[in-house]
């Protein structure tokens, strides 16, 4: 991925380092930035109690009223493991504002080159315990984003994140299309209602429609070694609810009813080569029309540049496959008289795909281990042993002849802990058989990970998915 810098300039720098003397205890400093086109304005302030908050307006019309920011953490032994609320008793150390305008080249997508134009505000804060936390805002022409950053510091080497207090208090109540987080499968029916009538958890992305006919989109970007966010509503405010770790986690132990959401090692080198850690970006896209909402590039601009050096193997495609017959009851995943993933069926599907312009054919149920996969504790899946009626050599030869990819399927039944030890062997087997595309599956609300029983969207789950991606990239 290539980057092409355009003019980059700093504007109104109060200070460039966050270790300067306090600007004043619990005053009400106001810092304002505007989007590059001037239509959006963001204001950061501290209350008299040292509570960080922000507000957002568009052409002088309020969109977000002052909304809460911050986190609750349990710090390591350097501060006696105490619970610290980084949502009050904060002092402003410094701010830094920069204007950025760059163009970068995508691996693939609707556009080859994407412009990243935004104004960035970094707010450096310090809690009364001495712990420092930065909040970084980015204001685009079609929305805003922010994230929390913890500089490397002696007082904060390892810590637990207990809560994130990011909130969105809307000046005008929007309606939202949502499904609850508790479904865990993203397969519930989307319901539209005013946010004040949303009484369950919400998954992101969350699409909003405002009274003036404009639209919004709440989601996150750059999710790395962190739990995925969920949301919940109270009146006209949307709050953040991080996916918690479960008590069986081997990542850490704790006492009490409240489970932490993440364990952070703040001493590890970051991608920039320095210690420190950051949360994912929290983003709100704002557009006048739905097509503009879809066309926004904020999420892509917030994700870090691709770290995979050779991206030639990453190719999007439309595909068909053997899977829906299982849901209809006309086929089975396991071997039987109606087994779906057979040599004959794959041959028929591949010929159809070649005739009609599809790039690949997915084969669910090609490998051994499906006999008891729906049981609470599934048997061990084999990712390098096909069923006897699935001749993988003849199928992959046909795949090469027709120019249609065979898409391998690695269903885990939620047993990520059994899948991870097989990753290298499973992907080596796929590569040896000229299988360049693999679909993974986690059909379980709670997955067995190397960190114990965890929610799919937990920090442990995110770590597992990253390991799979890194193995595939090798």
Locations of the language-model features?
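Short amphipathic alpha-helical segments and helix-helix/interface helices
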Residues: 165, 205-207, 215, 350, ...
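An acidic-aromatic substrate-binding cleft motif
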Residues: 270-351, 356, 360
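Conserved, mostly hydrophobic/aromatic
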Residues: 148, 353, 441
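Bacterial Sec-dependent N-terminal signal peptides
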Residues: 1-30
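Aromatic- and carboxylate-enriched substrate-binding clefts and catalytic-loop regions
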Residues: 364-474
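N-terminal accessory beta-strand-rich subdomains and adjacent acidic, glycine-rich linkers
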Residues: 30-308
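Short, flexible loop/turn elements at secondary-structure junctions
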Residues: 127, 139-141, 172, 287, ...
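Intrinsically disordered, low-complexity acidic regions
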Residues: 263-265, 347, 359-369, 373-374
